Curated annotation (Swiss-Prot):
Sites where a glycan is attached: N137, N146, N164, N210, N257, N628, N717, N799
Name the UniProt record assigns to this protein: Uncharacterized secreted protein ARB_06907
Record localization: Secreted
GO CC terms, sorted: extracellular region
Source organism of this protein record: Arthroderma benhamiae (strain ATCC MYA-4681 / CBS 112371) (Trichophyton mentagrophytes)
Keywords, ordered alphabetically: Glycoprotein, Secreted, Signal
GO molecular function: serine-type peptidase activity
Entries under InterPro entries matching the protein: AB_hydrolase_fold (IPR029058), Peptidase_S9_cat (IPR001375), Plant_Biomass_Hydrol_Est (IPR050955)
First-listed, main subcellular location of the protein, grouped into a coarse class: secreted
Pfam families, per database record: Peptidase_S9 (PF00326)
Length: 930
């Protein structure tokens, strides 16, 4: 009998932790049960299998241990065409576009009715601020086929360099290398009764036969293709091409290589074998039980994947809607933990609504990578959003580190740059020069090669849980060496990881012992300017600026004063120019906590040994010797909360609420001497905070004096004591009774707070015509964040804001007047029979229904959850609002936005309203409501 029958497969759910044994499919059930009992797989009184079947997998994350840029599966179940796209494409451009502006619309061809209404005419011209004589014309571009790729790739090369680029760049910098255009070609489908899986690297928006699709695959993840049921023949493809410097860089000519793949698939449930994510086997032990794989539903019906045996569980099935892709998570665990086979084979069983018979997918084989203990290893773990992620790591194995087995060592974090995966060899080996370091070396994935959202809300949650997963590693790997201090981090990162280092130490400073940002940029708007954005009202423009300030680390330097910082940057870096590091070095000097700064002559952005230079080796070896550092908090320090921002503790102080999200909140702290025990706090724009004394890296205060009011600190109940300032400026202390649905707090705070979900997202679309948008929303969340998403076509309940189930954040897609199931309650934004209404301190502003009117806004649910409402008076307004679901950094969405028929042309410059909700879910005073 094959060795894999010695294995059991466990169901893994975000909602319950119970594990249930399961064997591979073998027809002779009784023989299997007898064998299992004899070999110890089933213990006396254990489960008897009336049917040995595939396992159900509760939806988790698809984040693979291989480079996600090659996840289109070229297996035998996929019907391939050599080159289904046209050789020649009609191109119209270039036109101006700002940094990450295309999410808002901002398409100049909307002034002519949209590209889809235009026919190729080499004599026609269109006004453009980037083209010669101010006129853009039609041109032709050709494709070539990369037949060595599997599946074959069709590559469309576009180079529409703006006229007089050198002079333009001298004025506007890298923003001058950004432009947009449209391209038209064809796609030929050869087979009937098939589904086309369309992959569109570098494309954010396109049309197929004049039907619009938004999201695409801008970074080339190839995780969630658009699944199309197209008839045989030729189909028109219109691509909106955007050259984004943040994604494509600014070195060399500003060309765009669009990569297209079209696969004709059979109508079934397809296992994407290249998406398999599993932990490594180290010294013959599987170091984590968590695993996942992506399924694509190319059938015309929903698919239920379910267990076929008696099992007590809270959620015993997972559903894929028509044309949906989802990652399916599960656990693998051996009874004989030191006898791991080289591979295991398994499959899924599923049913459809119109056929109760059980069907099965093709078999997939999981082949384990085997490592030795001193090597960098791949570990897997669950995220709160119900997905499986991974990190690579190296335990401290040297004899020097393990002299005292009772010792506990800090975590050394290495954050990768944009477009790289933690499993890439370049990342796995970047700290090999200090492989004997006495720390737990960890390379988080950030969920995706772009670290989710640049190591911010989504990516940082992955970082946090990759650290916590080290405790599980100790359990599963059989580790017997030194322990772990999972609250002491030494962090280093390169490029985007350097920016992630700035983010981490400015937002979660109490976790950091020391930091080394290497060739890191300071913020996205300092990396690529926003000077090409459409002009707009100054109050409206300030709204977008505030929405980006949570990630503008230049204004948050005071948050990490006192933490040792080593900076290194190549003097000849043409990717992230050295100005970024010089600027932060100067700002740290001004804060009174200067960094150590090392500029490497003649070196560019990346070079061999960059992360293990003598300068950085000194950094690592110095600060791994300072675990449990208790002297990092200066006598005087500050807490700076950015406008509409969110952060962890600084000096143990956690700001729960500001008075207004329209400006910075701050607390200046002067610590008294240890025998004095008094901390004096001076606050600005702080409404409520509490102390987490366990996070304080100094003596815990006996008293705190807040703007002159004195309170006794009792460490045992500090986390349940809140200090609150009323409207008159008086400070009081109290319990947690204030935490109700009328208050904004916890996971609801900050921009992109919607991404802080504790379970899979649920997207609800009751109206038939809105279902494609529900699928688009889930596809984009999966494509860009690897997030899991449940689609529901049920009518939202009238009391959805107070419902406690499901546990995650919601998206509700609504169309027309008083949408079925929607209730405004006491919300600041409501939808009546004739208008969209916004309540402010000045009264109620109503926007009567008109073509193109739409809105997107968050509203509170119980238990710190959020609901993202996407609404339109018609489909045009709804589709425009749906573009602003937060999946791409730098777009600058505030808490609410009201779009109109002018938004596709003028983007954010045309909005009726945009702004933020304060701590009581009221529209803030500086919000723009026209």
């Amino acid at each position: 009998m094959p060795s894999f029958v010695l294995w059991t497969f466990h169901l893994c759910s975000q909602w319950f932790q119970g594990l249930t044994d399961l064997l591979p499919h073998i027809p002779d059930t009784q023989t299997v049960n007898n064998f299992a009992s004899q070999t110890g797989l089933l213990y006396p009184g254990g489960m008897k299998y009336s049917k040995i079947a595939s396992w159900v997998c509760i939806p988790l994350l698809t984040c693979r241990g291989v480079d996600a840029t090659n996840s289109a599966d070229g297996g035998s179940e996929l019907q391939l065409n050599e080159s289904p796209f046209s050789k020649n494409w009609q191109v119209l451009g270039p036109f101006e576009i700002g940094t990450r502006e295309s999410s808002w619309g901002a398409d100049p061809l909307e002034a002519y009715g949209g590209f889809q209404t235009l026919q190729y005419d080499p004599k026609a011209s269109f006004d453009s601020s980037l083209a010669l004589n101010g006129l853009a014309n039609w041109s032709m571009a050709s494709t070539h086929v990369n037949s060595t790729a599997n599946p074959p790739e069709t590559i469309l090369d576009i180079n529409l360099s703006p006229d007089n680029l050198t002079s333009l760049q001298e004025v506007y910098g890298w923003d001058a290398k950004q432009y947009q255009a449209w391209a038209r070609g064809t796609l030929t489908v050869s087979k009937s009764n098939s589904v086309v899986a369309l992959y569109t690297d570098r494309i954010w928006e396109y049309r197929i036969d004049n039907k619009s699709y938004f999201g695409g695959d801008f970074f080339g993840f190839r995780r969630a293709p658009l699944l199309l049921d197209l008839s045989p023949g030729t189909h028109t493809v219109d691509l909106r091409v955007v050259r984004d410097v943040r994604a494509l860089g600014a070195v060399g000519e500003p060309f765009i290589n669009v990569t297209l793949i079209a696969q004709e698939l059979s109508k079934t449930l397809i296992v994407d074998k290249k998406s398999i994510l599993v932990a490594d086997v180290v010294e013959n032990r599987l170091i984590s039980p968590h695993a996942s794989v992506t399924l694509h539903n190319t059938m015309g019906n929903p698919v239920d994947v379910a267990a076929r045996f008696s099992l007590k569980m809270l959620n015993n099935n997972v559903k894929l809607e028509e044309a949906q892709s989802r990652a399916i998570g599960f656990t693998i665990e051996a009874k004989d933990k030191i006898n791991v086979p080289s591979s295991v084979s398994l499959y899924f069983e599923y049913t459809t609504p119109d056929d109760s018979s059980v069907q099965r997918t093709q078999t997939m084989t999981i082949t384990f990578t085997r490592r030795k203990l001193p090597e960098v290893q791949q570990n897997t773990f669950m995220l709160p959003g119900g997905v499986v992620s991974y990190a690579t790591m190296r335990p401290p194995t040297s004899l020097e580190c393990n002299k005292d087995k009772s010792a506990k060592l800090p975590v050394l974090l290495g954050l990768h740059g944009a477009g790289q995966a933690a499993s890439d060899e370049i990342i796995r080996t970047m700290l090999d020069g200090v492989s004997d370091i006495c720390a737990w070396t960890l390379f988080p994935s950030g969920v995706t090669p772009w670290s989710g959202d640049d190591w911010h809300t989504w990516g940082f949650a992955d970082l946090q849980h990759s650290v916590r997963a080290l405790n599980d590693y100790i359990k599963y790997s059989g580790w017997t060496g030194v322990g772990l201090i999972d609250g002491d981090w030494i962090i280093a990162g390169h490029s985007n990881g350097g920016q992630g280092t700035w983010y981490t130490i400015s937002h979660y400073p109490d976790k950091i012992i020391a930091a080394a940002p290497v060739a890191g940029y300071t913020s996205i708007e300092n990396y690529v300017p926003y000077s090409m954005w459409h002009n707009t009202d100054s109050l409206l423009a300030s709204t977008f600026y505030r929405a980006r300030q949570d990630f503008k680390h230049e204004i948050l330097v005071d948050n990490f004063a006192g933490i040792p910082v080593y900076q290194q940057h190549g003097a000849s870096d043409d990717n992230v120019v050295v100005y970024h590091s010089r600027l932060m070095h100067r700002l740290l000097q001004e804060s009174g906590s200067p960094s150590k700064y090392h500029e490497v002559p003649g070196k560019n952005h990346w070079y061999t040994g960059i992360m293990t230079s003598d300068f950085l080796k000194d950094f690592y070896r110095t600060y791994v010797q300072r675990p449990n550092a208790t002297d990092l908090l200066p006598q005087r320090f500050s807490v700076t909360l950015p406008p509409a921002g969110h952060m962890g503790t600084r000096g143990g102080i956690y700001v729960d609420q500001s008075h207004t999200p329209d400006r910075v909140g701050s607390i200046e702290v002067e610590r008294g001497m240890a025998n004095d025990g008094v901390w004096k706090l001076k606050t600005r724009n702080i409404r409520r905070f509490h102390l987490e004394t366990s996070a304080i890296r100094s003596h815990v205060p006996l008293y705190i004096q807040i703007d002159g009011s004195r309170f006794t600190v009792t460490p045992s109940n500090s986390t349940t004591t809140w200090y609150t300032q009323d409207a008159a400026g008086k400070w009081t202390s109290g319990g947690d009774s204030w935490r109700t649905i009328s208050q904004r707090y916890g996971r609801q705070a900050g921009v992109n707070a919607f991404l802080r979900t504790e379970a899979p997202f649920t997207v609800t679309a009751a109206a038939q015509e809105t279902r494609d948008l529900a699928l688009q929303t889930c596809r984009n969340l999966f494509q860009y964040l690897s997030a899991d998403c449940i689609i529901s076509y049920a009518v939202p309940t009238a009391n959805s804001t107070t419902a406690t189930s499901p546990a995650g954040n919601n998206v509700v897609i609504l169309l027309g007047a008083q949408p079925n199931g929607y209730t405004a309650g006491d919300s600041a934004i409501s939808i009546s029979a004739r208008s969209l209404d916004i309540k402010t301190s000045q009264g109620t502003t109503s926007y009567p229904f008109e073509p193109g009117l739409g809105a997107i806004f968050i509203r509170p649910l119980v238990n710190e959850r959020l609901e993202l409402v996407i609404w339109g008076s018609d489909m045009a307004g709804l589709q425009q609002a749906a573009r602003l679901v937060p999946v791409l950094t730098g777009v600058g969405q505030p808490d609410f936005v009201v779009v109109n028929k002018g938004t596709p042309l003028k983007g954010q410059g045309s909005l009726y309203a945009a702004g933020f909700f304060d701590s009581e879910w009221k529209v803030s005073a500086a919000s723009y409501v026209s």
